[in-house]
Amino acid sequence: MFPPVLFKKVKRNNKKRVVLRAAAILLIGSVLGFIAAGLWSLTWNDRVFTVRYELASDKVDSGFRVLLITDLHLREFGEGNSMLVARARDAAPDIICLGGDMIETYASYEQDEAFVSLVKRLVEIAPVYIGIGNHDAFAFYSWCARTDMEMTSFGGVTNLTRAVEEAGAVVLEKGFEDIEINGEKVRLGGFYPFAFRDEGDTDESWESRRVFLEDYCDTELFKLMISHRAVSFYREDAPDNWDIDLVVSGHTHNGVVALPGIGAIWENEGFFPKHSRGMFHEGKLNIVVCAGLDGHGCIPRVFNPPEIVVIDVKAK
């Protein structure tokens, strides 16, 4: 018969093994459950979800509704994007902003025609304004000026630009219009490059952008800006320099792969980025970032359903 002390030691070791085994089973089960949930989340990728935000402003009375659609990258949701058009119609917007990367520079003639067809159907719902992104800039413009790796200005309209404008849309880049939305007077602009002086800027390249932004901001009207990359406005001194009521952006795809309740794992901003999706107040700016519709090349969206964004601008 074993001594009592030795018996108790064996008993404690048995308890330890049981605890470790239970912990291992729990860990493996959790990992398998997480993987299964991630695979299940891939089924969301053929649907379009609508996300809603509200913004109060003392510059409006009756208010208006903005629909933001970004980063389609030639994808189709239903034949001829019928699902996307249906979601846009259900949103009942007063204005539709296409926030860039809706198409690709390398798109075929047939893909260009499909995009023009989509624009025509969206124009039937509400006025459509198009901002450019890094993937479709040369679908709408034939040349650009650069500093290092940054595109700073664009020119030379293409056949696609002419086609979408004939369809009733307006392409805005480094330009703005004073328009009326649901009875509210609004200054609407489009601006892709950085709204701050970058280290690669020359005096000339920055001065051109600075003058445009000063002209754009010189109004008492509600200011709405389509800017594909939110980083163009939230970095450096841009939030303190430019008083813009609402900047609408995309570009991030919410990092493509996200974690439930946390958000994007990584995006160009870094790990667990702040500005990958949602509504933010930075300095004098309000920024809404749409997670967009497509994945990233061969990488599917995980825990990151494709979305369009509705922003209700209401009286304060």
Region spans (language model):
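Active-site neighborhood of phospho(di)ester-bond hydrolases with catalytic His/Asp-centered motifs
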Residues: 68-70, 95-101, 127-134, 172-175, ...
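Solvent-exposed loop/turn segments at secondary-structure junctions
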Residues: 73-74, 102-105, 134-138, 177-179, ...
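N-terminal membrane-anchoring alpha-helices
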Residues: 1-60
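Binuclear metal-dependent hydrolase catalytic cores centered on His/Asp/Glu-rich metal-binding motifs
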Residues: 143-169, 181-223, 233-234, 239, ...
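Membrane-embedded segments
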Residues: 62-170
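Conserved beta-sheet core of the metallophosphoesterase superfamily
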Residues: 230-309
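Beta-strand-turn-beta hairpins that frame and shape the catalytic cleft
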Residues: 56-67, 169-170, 176-188, 218-222, ...
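Mobile, glycine- and charge-enriched loop segments
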Residues: 45-78, 215-216, 221-224
